[in-house]
UniProtKB/Swiss-Prot annotation:
This is Vacuolar protein sorting/targeting protein 10. Keywords: Glycoprotein, Golgi apparatus, Membrane, Protein transport, Receptor, Repeat, Signal, Transmembrane, Transmembrane helix, Transport. It comes from Paracoccidioides brasiliensis (strain Pb18). It is found in: Golgi apparatus, trans-Golgi network membrane; Prevacuolar compartment membrane. Residues 1-21 form the signal peptide. Residues 1384-1409 are cytoplasmic. The gene is VPS10. Disulfide bonds: none annotated. GO terms for cellular component: cytosol; Golgi apparatus; membrane.
């Protein structure tokens, strides 16, 4: 949404007056000189009081005589402190001065007096500072930031009494709005007091600060008695990703964007309670690609970008009366890159719109280099039809909003029917300085030239006076006309002043005879600024009488007769053009007169649940219609229902004798919601002319995207590429006859994919395969198996292409060159040569430039020297910065950039370099207790919890690999051990997986016989689980009985697992398809896996299938044998199918796996190789991939669509009431954490929406599963982890690493200039993720003042002085000595340990003791995945978040890969974060230098 306020840069300081000679037949002109250009100039309504601001000096000025004399506003504390000046949009008496130092001022009497108020807030451009109530001018929101040093957070204040009192409304809100935000909001709806008090605020998500998780909350009590309720934007459900709200006329709009798409959803309300999603006739609405325009009282006008953003054009849409359905008015409207649209409604006249469109739009779509040819068009029927502007017989084209030359409206004013503009006649619009001034006095029907050259212009005295000033350079005169622009006179500026005009304006209603001209004049080397008043009040003109006026029809039809709109004709009493008089009705705007018309087709719109038909002549159902009570007992019954039309609300047409399109008609019951369903699962099998498939991936439609497609792209073993838009029911081959060698789905946007050839030609789709566009690369793709395309995380169309140069013959001259494009390949620009990989670094978590790019380049552009430099730039390498001279690789994540830096001695060692901002790097301190003789390989895991996670390889012997997971502090530089002996395979991937959708649950397979493995024995695995993000790990509890009701051969102790009897599951390194994860991001609490019960994990062939419904606490055996599984409809459907054996049937569950039903999907046995659904697991469709193997088999690979949407139990949508979440088909589920009986995890309790398993309904689009974060808990030892150089013990204790010292705690004083104190090390540090408050402060016990900060320290600790300070310091020392002696003499552990103790009483070591804490390490990563689709031998690789493959030594083909989104082929199977989690390593460096690197 484009919200803008037009100002001019500059300021004023000194005022000096000049006066021209007074003449009876010309205006009086007086000039006031200022040293700085004035800004924020405005009139108070219905007055001659004008204000402006000197922003440079921080002063404000006021004039009470329409700009003749100016006085500085002198208030205590205001001098030099004014930051901005604002007028109230609807109250003509109020204005506001926002100050620089927390003091602000308000006037309620047009600047006669001022009231000071205080609010500690700083103002940034990201928030609109003042938000006004539409009906009560005393109600205002004040938005900004509260800053302490560099740490700033959003804060919103509110007042209900005009700032007599001010209170904090909410903190950390990203924008707030009153529900009643305009004077006409809710008119005729009898709004309740609650809605009048209602405020909507955009706030961060409950578990994530990123904008994709923003929520829209509302409160009717100023967030005092509640924390807000989520607005039910979409069919009664809350929506995440709300990016902004805006008000226009009687509507409030909210825009939301889902993660991994640039497409927006717009939601509209006209009563503050009921929201509807706006539909745009199939048009995509992109982020920052639409503009809410000036609208009417009965519809919204929105311009939506249609095509190339680099040469933006739009489509103009107009809504129905409730803002739900938008119809297309005109295509190819002219826009600019700032979102301004060449669109204006003619003031005071209903239905007349003036737009500019692009004549050569087809050429512009083909190339951004083509200059747009712009033409002007006008509509007299509210945008239904458009026609050219005519000046005589010639087409006229006028400069509009995209070329603003004045403040206020471009063409019109409240002067009835008078319209002006700068432009030219001919085939299209020329440059502004090639234009002339044109005028129309019949609201745009006919035009004539007024003045040569471009001029600024303004209307006065209801159009009796027009003033114009030359706008192509300096001028010393003005021009004016007293007869609608037919004839013109000139008047000179006083004292020979020549200015460059900046603003020409008058009072807002254009009823006065005074004007203001702002301009600048250059004398010698000085620039002088003037505010010039122009007054026609003393001219010898009589006052107009009755005979001087005419009845003027505002609109004419094609027969030149008064036209009807909204049920009436509109007329004005307007002064005749050629009479010699002034109206002199100051502050009295012209009042329209209306004459009613009989109802016609134009007076009706589509009713609720209906949309315009394709031909636009009828209204057809948009969805199944609600059934009338008592009707539709049988499918063939009929009932009386809506015709599809309704009279537009507010339309005043006469019913009698007119058209009645809204009369009820007879409808058939098949249109209703109660159509009986077949109750059957529908199957559609498709065979392909290939023996197998090489890969598939989903282009998933997100919640904010339009349509209902479920798009899959599949590649066969014969290299044919097929697409389905309906999840496999119908397939179509794309690019037949083309040799596609690479398919590269966008790393960050699921709507986008690129299809490449070896020649450099390619195609891309921006809309999930609905359309394909061709592009040409600057050079062919590289031949080094480097990533060809790199993507920007936030700018969808920004690309980096790494291609091959001088490579026709493979020789030493062949090298890689990087180019970049900001318009998806329409234009390319050179970036750097001799590169290996280049990436955009911008992330939402860091404030870096959008242009920040990192590249790996061979030193001295010589790949033979084996040294890769890490370089960065934010100006496309006009300048560059060298971060490291010899690196192996780097990984970019949401919060960190981690670099594998090669060591000097030994040469094959690695160090870790870390940066949080992309500017400054520091080396990481790895824990000494992770015994790694030489750091040679590590895997970068997830970093969304304000900490980085690494898997560090401890044993690198082939087939015997394992390592440790370590976790960093908040800046990624200091690491502690989390879990040892985690299994790793030869390629560097670890058996580690986080449960999706829940905090704190992760599973890992560890090597259970480390000592034997070190001697050469085969690895034996055990599965461990954590429910508190690594604070404690335990074996999986086995089921009490198997699926056949029999006991297992081993036994547990009281139901708890033992070393001899636990459940073990096969993990990532054993999966044929890495996308087959245990859990789903939408099936909260549910996991499936295959494995066995016993001492260790056994062979896969011996595995059975298990399920948990409570986050891994308890498990149940589903079936003997191993099955493949998939979640559908957010877990309300679970489908399993046998793995590695032929079958005709599948099993499905509708109650989270409690019971299962068998379904036969084929007559011929099939061997199913995979089962899939959309990445979010929200569809009711599944795909089985396999081959027929039984009698009567057909050749070729088959894709079998299994559709549950017609199943009776899944045909009705579940009901969720956000205000009463347990009232209908859902309940609130609170995860249980077995080691924390109070339910706290990271200092809070969480509650999730889950469907009741016994309800027969479907969930539909993905829920915001997390309903709330309940109680904030007091800090306990579980909210802390071991500090650097402290390590967790096997028995749960925390001890110093022998022989090592903690980090110097005084470093904070030098690293943070704001630091006042440092604390003595305690061995503990607070977990970055915890929200706990109060309680145990284990990390801060004994404070000390930083050097030269003693005074601030004593102010912070006022009691620590003199004797008191002595005892505070000495008491802990004495107590520590006493405890030390006691422990040394009484405790067998002696020094070096802090015992965990039991939960009961335990003296010093009880669970609540301040002296001890359990080490907590967050394990919140995702499984590393090689997201590969081999299309042509090692060349087709898909990565949603980034992929890089670097073969290492011997035959290992060491992989350095993204682990953040194997979801490539399945997009988001693990719901991975936007980190590019990678495997970094160094093996056999000499060989690795000459090896190839894999495809991104």
């Amino acid at each position: 949404m484009i919200l803008r306020r037009l100002v001019l840069a500059g300021s004023l300081l000194l005022a000096t007056a000049f006066t021209s000679a007074k003449k009876a037949d010309s205006p009086i002109i007086m000039a006031t000189r200022f040293d700085h250009e004035p800004i924020n100039l405005f009139y108070f309504g219905d007055s001659d009081v004008v204000m402006l601001q000197d922003i440079k000096n921080g002063d404000v000025y006021v004039s009470r005589d329409a700009g003749v004399k100016w006085d500085m506003v002198n208030l205590d504390g205001l001098k030099g402190q004014a930051l901005s000046l604002w007028s109230h949009p609807t109250d003509r008496t109020k204005a506001y001065i926002l100050g620089k130092a927390g003091k602000h001022w308000v006037t309620n009497d047009q600047a006669v007096s001022w009231h000071e108020f205080s609010a500690d807030v700083e103002f940034f451009q990201s928030l609109f500072p003042l938000v006004f109530h539409g009906k009560d001018s005393d109600r205002v929101l004040l938005q900004g930031h509260k800053c302490v040093g560099r740490d700033c957070k959003e804060v919103t204040y509110y007042t209900t009494d005009g700032f007599k009192t001010v209170d904090i409304l909410i903190e950390n809100a990203r924008g707030c709005n009153w529900a009643v935000s305009t004077p006409i909001f809710g008119d005729g709806l009898n709004l309740s007091k609650e809605v009048n008090d209602r405020i909507f605020c955009i706030v961060p998500g409950l578990q994530s600060p990123w904008s994709d998780y923003n929520r829209l909350l509302y409160s009717d009590r100023f967030f005092k008695q509640d924390s807000g309720t989520e607005a039910p934007l979409d069919s009664g459900r809350a929506v995440s990703g709300v990016v902004r709200t805006a008000s226009v006329k009687k509507y409030l709009l909210a825009a939301a964007k889902s993660a991994r798409t640039s497409e927006l959803a717009l939601y509209v309300t006209d009563d503050g309670s009921q929201w509807h999603r706006a539909e745009f006739d199939g048009q995509r609405v992109e982020e920052d690609a639409y503009t809410v325009l000036e609208s009417t009282n009965y519809s919204i006008q929105i311009d939506v970008v249609a095509e190339t953003p680099s040469a933006p054009m739009g489509t103009l849409f107009t809504s129905n009366s409730n803002g739900t359905y938008f119809t297309r008015n005109i295509d190819h409207t002219n826009r600019n890159g700032l979102g301004f649209v060449d669109f204006e409604k003619i003031a005071t006249i209903q239905g007349i719109i003036l737009v500019n469109t692009v004549k050569n739009w087809e050429d512009v779509e083909m190339s951004a280099l083509v200059e747009k040819k712009i033409i002007s068009q006008i509509s007299f029927d509210d945008g239904r039809t458009f026609q050219p502007l005519k000046a005589g017989k010639h087409d006229l084209h006028l400069h509009s909003v995209t070329h603003l030359s004045n403040s206020g409206r471009v063409f019109s004013s409240p002067a009835p029917g008078l319209v002006m503009g700068v432009g030219n006649t001919g085939g299209h619009l020329k440059d502004y300085y090639d234009g002339d001034l044109y005028v129309s006095d019949d609201a745009g029907i006919t035009w004539r030239k007024a003045l040569d050259e471009a001029h600024k212009y303004e209307f006065g005295d209801q159009g009796s006076v027009i003033v114009a000033v030359f706008d192509e350079g300096r001028t010393g005169k003005i021009s004016y006309s007293l007869n609608h622009g037919k004839d013109w006179k000139e008047a000179s500026l006083p004292d020979g002043i020549k200015i460059r005009a900046r603003i020409l304006t008058t009072m807002p209603d254009s009823t006065g005879l005074k004007f203001l001209l702002v301009g600048s004049s250059k004398r010698d080397s000085d620039v002088e600024h003037y505010v010039i008043s122009i007054s026609f009040t003393d001219m010898e003109e009589r006052t107009c009488g009755k005979d001087d006026f005419e009845t003027w029809p505002a609109r004419l039809n094609e027969k030149n007769e008064p036209d009807c709109l909204m049920g009436h004709k509109q007329f004005y009493q307007r002064r005749k053009a050629d009479v010699d008089c002034f109206i002199k009705k100051k502050f009295q705007e012209p009042v329209p007169q209306f004459e009613p018309c009989k109802c016609t087709v134009e007076d009706f719109e589509c009713d609720f649940n209906f949309i315009r038909s394709t031909e636009g002549k009828s209204c057809v159902p948009a969805r199944s219609l609600p059934v009338p009570e008592g009707a539709c007992k049988k499918p063939n019954d009929k009932y009386m229902g809506s015709s599809g039309f309704r009279l537009i609300p507010g339309n005043a047409c006469i019913r009698e004798g007119g058209v009645e399109l809204d009369k009820q008609i007879e409808r058939v019951c098949t249109d209703t919601l109660t159509v009986p369903v077949s109750g059957e699962i529908v199957v559609q099998k498709t065979f392909f002319t290939a023996d197998n498939y090489k890969g598939y991936f989903y282009l998933e439609r997100k919640d904010s995207s339009k349509g209902d497609d479920e798009t899959v792209i599949m590649i066969t073993s014969e290299l044919q590429i097929y697409i389905t838009r309906d999840h496999g029911k119908n397939w179509k081959e794309i690019f037949p006859g083309e040799t596609i060698t690479r398919i590269v789905p966008h790393q960050y946007f699921d709507d986008v994919a690129y299809f490449l050839t070896n020649s450099g030609d390619g195609w891309y789709t921006l809309d999930r395969g609905e359309n394909f566009r061709k592009f040409k690369a600057p050079i062919p793709p590289n031949q080094d198996k480097l990533p060809v395309l790199s993507f920007h995380p936030e700018r969808r169309d920004w690309l980096i292409w790494t291609g091959a140069e001088e490579c026709k013959t493979r020789g030493p001259q062949c090298h890689s060159v990087a180019y970049y494009s900001t318009n998806h390949g329409s234009e390319w620009h050179f970036l750097m040569q001799y590169v290996r990989r280049c990436e955009f670094i911008k992330r939402e978590a860091r404030g870096s430039s959008n242009n920040l790019v990192f590249c790996e380049q061979f030193e001295n552009e010589n790949p033979l020297n084996h040294h890769l430099q890490l370089l960065s730039t934010d100006d496309w390498f006009s300048e560059k910065k060298v971060h490291y001279n010899n690196i192996l690789d780097f990984a970019t994540m949401q919060e960190f950039i981690i670099v594998a830096v090669r060591g000097e001695k030994p040469e094959d060692s690695l160090s870790v370099g870390v940066s949080v901002d992309g500017e400054t790097f520091a080396y990481a301190d790895l824990p000494a207790n992770v015994q790694i003789p030489v750091q040679r390989a590590y895997t970068v895991l997830e970093s969304r919890t304000h900490a980085a996670f690494l898997h560090v390889t401890v044993n690198n012997v082939e087939d015997h690999e394992y390592g440790s997971i370590i976790k960093s502090n908040s800046n990624g530089t200091s690491y502690v051990l989390s879990l040892s002996a985690v299994n790793r395979n030869t390629y560097g991937y670890a058996d580690f997986e986080k449960m999706q959708g829940m905090e704190g649950v992760a599973m890992a397979n560890v090597v259970g016989n480390v000592a034997d493995v070190e001697k050469g024995a085969a690895k034996k695995y055990r599965t461990m689980i954590t429910h508190n993000d690594g604070a404690e790990w335990a074996l999986l509890s086995p089921p009490s009985k198997d699926s056949e009701g029999r006991d297992y051969s081993c036994s547990t102790e009281g139901g708890k697992p033992t070393d001899k009897c636990a459940l073990h599951l096969h993990s990532y390194t054993e999966r044929a398809d890495p996308r087959d994860t245990y859990s789903s991001p939408s099936a909260i609490g549910v996991m499936l896996g295959t494995g066995n019960v016993g001492e260790y994990l056994t062979l896969k062939s011996d595995a059975d299938t298990f399920i948990t419904r409570d986050g891994g606490i308890t498990w149940q055996e589903v079936r003997k044998d191993r099955y493949q599984w998939e979640f559908g409809d957010s877990g309300s459907i679970i489908v399993i199918v046998p793995e590695s054996r032929p079958t005709k049937t599948l099993l499905y569950s509708l109650d989270e796996g409690k019971s299962w039903k068998e379904f036969q999907f084929t007559e011929v046995e099939m061997l199913i190789r995979d089962i899939s659904t959309v990445p979010s697991d929200t569809s009711r469709n599944f795909l089985l991939w396999g081959n027929e193997v039984g009698n009567g088999k057909k050749p070729g690979v088959a894709a079998v669509n299994i559709d549950f949407s017609n199943l009776k139990e899944r045909h009705k949508q579940c009901v969720l009431n956000e205000e009463k979440p347990e009232a209908d088909d859902y309940y609130l589920w609170e995860p249980m954490h077995p080691f924390q009986p109070n339910g706290c995890l990271f200092g809070h309790r969480a509650k999730y929406h889950r469907k009741r398993p016994d309800r027969d309904c479907f969930i539909g689009r993905e829920l915001q599963h997390l309903d709330s974060i309940g109680d904030i808990c007091e800090c306990t030892r579980s909210d802390y982890e071991c500090d650097y150089n402290y390590e967790p013990q096997i028995d749960g204790t925390c001890a110093p690493v022998p022989g090592l010292k903690p980090l110097d705690p005084k470093l904070i004083c030098t690293e943070d200039p704001k630091a006042v104190e440092w604390y003595e090390p305690t061995g503990y540090r607070r977990i970055p993720l915890t929200k706990c408050e109060g309680g145990k402060q284990l990390h801060h016990i004994i404070p000390h003042a930083c050097p030269n900060k003693e005074e601030e320290f004593l102010k912070k600790h006022p009691g620590l002085r003199g004797v008191g300070l002595f005892f505070v310091i000495m008491s802990p020392i004495g107590l520590a000595a006493a405890i030390g002696y006691y422990v040394y003499t009484r405790w067998d552990g002696k020094f070096g340990r802090i015992r965990l103790g039991d939960t009961g009483s335990g003296g010093f070591f009880a669970s609540d003791s301040l002296l001890i804490s359990i080490p907590v390490a967050i394990v919140a990563g995702v499984v590393a995945v090689a997201t590969a689709l081999p299309l042509l031998a090692s060349s087709l690789w898909r990565s949603v978040r980034g992929y890089a493959r670097v073969p290492g030594g011997s035959s290992s083909q060491r992989v350095y890969s993204s682990r953040a989104a194997f979801a490539a082929q399945r997009a988001d199977y693990v719901g991975v974060v936007d980190d590019e989690d990678e495997l970094l390593g160094a093996e056999d460096f000499d060989e690795e230098e000459n090896d190839d690197r894999g495809q991104v």
